[in-house]
A protein has these predicted regions:
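Acyl-donor (CoA/ACP) binding surface of acyl/acetyltransferases
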Residues: 1-32, 61-184
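An amphipathic alpha-helix signature
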Residues: 18-25, 45, 49, 53
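Conserved GNAT-fold acetyl-CoA-binding loop/helix
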Residues: 32-52
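A generic membrane alpha-helix/interface feature
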Residues: 48-50, 56, 144, 167
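Short loop/turn motifs at secondary-structure junctions and domain boundaries
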Residues: 53-58, 150
Length: 184
């Protein structure tokens, strides 16, 4: 699996070791982080370790690591038509998901990570489009997508989230041709 760098971040695979599990728990236990994205807060370091083992070791799943400290403070990932995803995507498309710990909200770190992963999507993976979704009320996620060039595609009401509740999800999409034009 690849490792990517930005001016302030390293995007690298999660490791099944105590340091990564502890860092994941530190930020994923906060009820302001997971539920708005559709997943429950983590309940222990052991729970976070199991999440790493079961979900975060897939290809194209990256810890968002601060270069300055070496600490994972969030996650960014790509999901394809043959893996879990919520958008109706074609074989040459992916869905991107991300989150970052509350202390790092508003610092532009996730847009920095998204832009780097988009470069990977279009230059290395030769994808034709990348999707992102956000639930009603998740204005921070919507703003990240807008800042990174995604455009509104459609809304799906009455969707069951991974938490089991019914929500409205909005989908945005960035085409390779749009990204290439904006990258010039």
């Amino acid at each position: 699996m690849s490792i990517f760098e930005t001016p302030r971040l390293i995007l690298r695979p999660w490791k099944e070791k105590d340091e990564d599990a502890e860092a994941l728990y530190k930020y994923a236990k906060d009820p302001a982080v997971g539920p708005i994205a559709g997943w429950p807060p983590h309940t222990s370091v052991g729970h976070s370790r199991e999440v790493i083992r079961a979900l975060l070791t897939y290809p194209e799943v990256y810890a968002v690591v601060l270069k300055e400290t070496g600490e994972p403070v969030g996650n960014i990932s790509l999901m394809f038509s043959n893996t879990a995803h919520t958008a109706d995507i074609a074989d040459n498309e992916a869905e991107m998901g991300y989150w970052i710990g509350v202390p790092y909200w508003g610092q532009g770190l996730i847009p920095e990570a998204v832009r780097r992963l988009l470069q990977h999507c279009f230059e290395d993976l030769d994808l034709q489009a990348v999707w992102c979704g956000y639930y009603d009320g998740n204005v921070r996620s919507k703003r990240v997508q807008e800042k990174c060039g995604f455009r509104f595609n459609h809304t799906e009401a009455g969707k069951r989230s991974p938490l089991g509740d019914i929500r409205t999800e909005h989908f945005m999409k960035l085409l390779r041709t749009e990204w290439m034009k904006d990258a010039q």
